[in-house]
Regions:
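Active-site-proximal inter-transmembrane loops
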Residues: 104-126
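Membrane-anchoring alpha-helices and their flanking helix-loop junctions
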Residues: 1-109, 129-164, 168-188
Length: 188
């Protein structure tokens, strides 16, 4: 069992250490009103890959097992996973470009489709499928890790992404932000 905790610990450590670097590079990119380089984008995916590995291992082995009915956990978890994947995919499809979806094309602000109800549906989709994975595994540690990621993503959007989008798109973004909530909102 020590190998499991070591693997989860290393994954969390790599996520944190790479996150410090990645978010500082994102800040530098946003300060220049630039776009994500392929290197930065790859590091972003590696960083979150290690995070996902920690959540998946924690869930797969039921670390810090929560006494929830197994049928409820499986059913509810799979529903959350499917909903999360659909929301994530819908957000990506609305961009109509992988480059735009990954921050490499900033030619226009996307406010249509699922973006009428959330300014960050891709993050919401990830949150749902991660919650589903944690629920299926009934892992308390996975839920703690998800809570940490929610804090990180909220800080990222409020401190880095939103000021950048406001500088980039100006009044168009301010109007959009006044109509649509950061996470989930009813259309205003």
């Amino acid at each position: 069992m020590i190998w499991l905790y070591t693997g989860v610990g290393v994954s969390i450590g790599v996520w944190i250490i790479s996150g410090v670097y990645v978010f500082s590079e994102i800040k530098n990119t946003y300060d220049r009103n630039g776009v994500f380089t392929s290197k930065l984008l790859n590091l972003w995916f590696v960083m979150w890959g290690f995070y996902h590995l920690a959540v998946i291992l924690s869930s797969l082995y039921g670390l810090w097992l929560i006494p929830i009915d197994k049928r409820f956990a499986l059913t509810g978890g799979f529903v959350l996973i499917v909903v999360g994947i659909v929301v994530l995919a819908t957000g990506m499809i609305e961009f109509r470009s992988l480059r735009r979806s990954c921050g490499q094309d900033i030619s226009r602000l996307i406010t249509t489709g699922i973006y009428r109800w959330s300014r960050n549906p891709q993050f919401i989709g990830c949150l749902f499928y991660l919650l589903g994975i944690a629920l299926v595994g009934r892992s308390g540690l996975a839920f703690v890790l998800i809570g940490a990621a929610v804090i990180v993503i909220d800080l990222y959007t409020t401190r880095l992404e939103e000021p950048y989008l406001e500088r980039l798109y100006g009044e168009e973004y301010r109007l959009y932000r006044s109509r649509v909530g950061r996470w989930i909102s009813m259309r205003r």
